[in-house]
Amino acid sequence: MGMDLTNYVEVRDHKTGEWKIAPVQVETVHYEAEHMDKPCCLTKIVYEYDYAQPWYGRNSELFSILEGGNYNSILSYSRGLPSDVSKEVYDFHEQFKNEDFDGYWSYGESYLTLAELSSALTDRKKYPKWIKYRDEFGSKIKEHGSYWDLKDFVDAIRYFTNLVPGVYDSNDVRVVFWFDC
């Protein structure tokens, strides 16, 4: 069992000051090894998003940075959902509490602005940047250093923000996230 990171990018409306989910239509392609011991056998997986979700799935390094644990520094302790969270993100979060969602549950609800995340990237010493290999549960797992995982996360948020019409300051862009299993 593992924890997935559920996350959505929100932008602040310049006219009303309200936060809204970043509405984008995007298709991403991800290649995944069918068998961890045979990385040559890759399967093409296409994800389609109606809303900006900069990260899909599990990543223990990013989890440690966002929620704490292991050896990493934590960016911020859980703040809960923002009081002014967009209706769409609030509704998505409520689905995880619904019994019809097959018993999924969430924890570690929080949010960070693009400014906060970008600032964290300036201090590379906090985050190991080497690539590690380790054997765990009989399979080979390749983990990228946590600095690069954070950088990829921030780059994805910037990418999605650029798809939204308008110009946004880094304090007017945030990612709202939680963990679920």
Q: How does the language model describe each region?
A:
Residues M1-V173, D180-C181:
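Acidic (Asp/Glu-rich) sequence patches and key acidic residues
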